[in-house]
Structure formats: C-alpha cells, structure tokens
C-alpha cells in the first residue's frame, strides 16, 4: 500500500492537499450553529443516495406512480426504510437550511466581501424549496395531485404571461402525465445538477474568504 501511496503522492501531491484542508484557520468564535450549512449538505447527500435507490422501483406515470410507491413501501427490500429516510432528511434539510440562513443573517455573514456567497446561498434556498414542491407530487396521490394543481395554478394571476406560464409548468392545459414527467425530471436531474453547481460555488467562496468574524 505504501508503494501505491508513494506513486500517487509523487503525481498528485496528496499530502499537500490534505495539509491545506486540515490546516485551515477556524476563528475562535465559531460554535455549533456554524455547522448548520454542513448539516444541510449532509442531508442533501442522503437525499441523493436514497432518491437514487428509489429510482430503481419508481415509475413516473399517472397510472403506475402510486402503485410503485406502494411497492417500495411494502415489498421492496428495505424500501420502507429508504423512503422514510428520504422524507425525514428532506424535512431536516429544509429546517437546517432555514436555520442556516437565519444564522448567517444574524451574524452579518452576508456583508462585504461575502455578498456573492450570500447570493448563491439564497439560490440554494430557492432550489431546496423547489425540491419540496416537485417531490411532493411524485407519489401522485390525492395530496400530491391537488398540491401540484394549486402550485402550478398560482402564476395564472400574472397578467399577459400567466396562462402560457401555467401551461409551461404543467406541460398542457391541465395537470396530467406531462406534468408528472416534468416534475420527475426536475426533481431527479435538473434540480440536483443545478444544486451541485451552486453548492460547489458556495463552498469554494467560503474556502477562499473564510468564515466571517463576529459582529
């Protein structure tokens, strides 16, 4: 193993990278509330893992979605546990994100020179809420159906562009298969990809600028 490590070290300078990560200065005022962002990231990773596992069984059609979720909960090995963890971590992610935003605001972490870090954080907060909206519809039960119908109907009040926007969200004039397909694609591919990009930007800026000092 040492020869393998030496070979990698010679080419990648692993030790230098490890030293840079572990030797980063942490201000003395940092407390447990500064861990809320990291907990949010952990919840996101749990979401990715459990969500990926459920894609093996979930069927995004209006005729099979509910039955496939029922199969996950009652017949698939550990399916009930995986889906339950997915739901619990989703709620935890939203809660930790809200608390993280409050912590940053109350401690002035959004001030110069960290304005862009705050902006990317706000975008991540919107993306987190979007995960909740799109994921809520996927079981395609009564609650999910009517939630989607109400949420996608809200933009209709916007003058001129309201109706076209509603049709864009739903995929048609009414809520149906096109709507479920759109929400499934958003929830499992588009939103995770965008979230990963903004998280990378967010963490790189934190890494570069460091943790903000006390007020």
Curated annotation (Swiss-Prot):
Residues binding heme b 1, per UniProt: 100, 202
A GO cellular component annotation in the UniProt record? plastid thylakoid membrane
**Membrane-spanning ranges:** 32-52, 90-110, 116-136, 186-206
Q: Name one GO molecular function term.
A: oxidoreductase activity
- The record lists heme b 2 as bound by 86, 187
Q: Which InterPro entries match?
A: Cyt_b/b6_N (IPR005797), Cyt_B6_PetB (IPR023530), Cytb/b6-like_sf (IPR027387), Cytochrome_b_N_euk/bac (IPR048259), Di-haem_cyt_TM (IPR016174)
Which family does the similarity line name? Belongs to the cytochrome b family. PetB subfamily.
On assembly, the entry states: The 4 large subunits of the cytochrome b6-f complex are cytochrome b6, subunit IV (17 kDa polypeptide, PetD), cytochrome f and the Rieske protein, while the 4 small subunits are PetG, PetL, PetM and PetN. The complex functions as a dimer.
Instruction: Return the protein name.
Output: Cytochrome b6
């Amino acid at each position: 193993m040492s020869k393998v490590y030496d070979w990698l070290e010679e080419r990648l300078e692993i030790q230098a990278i490890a030293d840079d990560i572990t030797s980063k200065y942490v201000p003395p005022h940092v407390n447990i509330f500064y861990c809320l962002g990291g907990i949010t990231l952990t919840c996101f990773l749990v979401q990715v893992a459990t969500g990926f596992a459920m894609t093996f069984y979930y069927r995004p059609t209006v005729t099979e979605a509910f039955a496939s979720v029922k199969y996950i909960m009652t017949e698939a090995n550990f399916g009930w546990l995986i889906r339950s963890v997915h739901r619990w971590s989703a709620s935890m992610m939203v809660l930790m994100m809200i608390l993280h935003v409050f912590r940053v605001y109350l401690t002035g972490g959004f001030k110069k020179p960290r304005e862009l870090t705050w902006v990317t954080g706000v975008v991540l907060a919107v993306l987190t809420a979007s995960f909740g909206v799109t994921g809520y519809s996927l079981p395609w039960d009564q609650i999910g159906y009517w939630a989607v119908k109400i949420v996608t109907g809200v933009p209709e009040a916007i003058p001129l562009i309201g109706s076209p926007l509603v049709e864009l969200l739903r995929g048609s004039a009414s809520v149906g298969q096109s709507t479920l397909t759109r929400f499934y694609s958003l929830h499992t591919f588009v939103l995770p990809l965008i979230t990963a990009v903004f998280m990378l930007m967010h963490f790189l800026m934190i890494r570069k600028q460091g943790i903000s000092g006390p007020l």
